[in-house]
């Protein structure tokens, strides 16, 4: 299982939100490239980038920052989400050196787009499913649909999606532990690997994820915990490596 540091981009800065609310943000750095360097130096093996402005506006806003990070670390797998709603945007990011693009809102509103993206960019597409009470939320979490997470995940099994990033919005940024039962249930219900996200606070939460014994969970995204110092990236990754030998 990979420990994946999150870098959320808002107005060119590295921030963290609470429960997806743009008005409830904390700025942790005005230099996201330097922040990426910190996590790379700390031993991370993948980075999770989110263009928060892009998620709300429906197109990339902080793309220059994403490109700068990808160019600085050409051998590091990077995944980017937020505002990815066209094949042109995906192509732009792939050419910039990004390893994976995360399709969120567009995947819910136009599932066929995911199939198109997977055909055009095989192995490069991740679907981001963000949920409130088991129902998928869209448009920067501003809207909640009537679509259930597991039902939608199953629709993408035949498309060649590389992974699903599952976020429980109620947990995100609250550092009260992630929704392990539902994450494990999602991993068991689909053949697509799952990356857990939202609410990780400390090493105990990582251990709890490992204790779920869900082989389909291949990663855990962490944000506020590593920024506020309640979780150490290297220590968490070492725990995962020991447990999964």
UniProtKB/Swiss-Prot annotation:
The keyword Amino-acid biosynthesis applies. Its main location: cytoplasm. Its EC number is 5.3.1.16. InterPro entries: Aldolase_TIM (IPR013785), His_biosynth (IPR006062), HisA_bact_arch (IPR006063), Isoase_HisA-like (IPR044524), Isoase_HisA-like_bact (IPR023016), RibuloseP-bd_barrel (IPR011060). GO terms for biological process: L-histidine biosynthetic process; L-tryptophan biosynthetic process. SUPFAM superfamilies: Ribulose-phoshate binding barrel. Disulfide bonds: none annotated. Pfam families: His_biosynth. This is 1-(5-phosphoribosyl)-5-[(5-phosphoribosylamino)methylideneamino] imidazole-4-carboxamide isomerase. It comes from Pseudomonas syringae pv. tomato (strain ATCC BAA-871 / DC3000). The lineage of its organism: Bacteria, Pseudomonadati, Pseudomonadota, Gammaproteobacteria, Pseudomonadales.
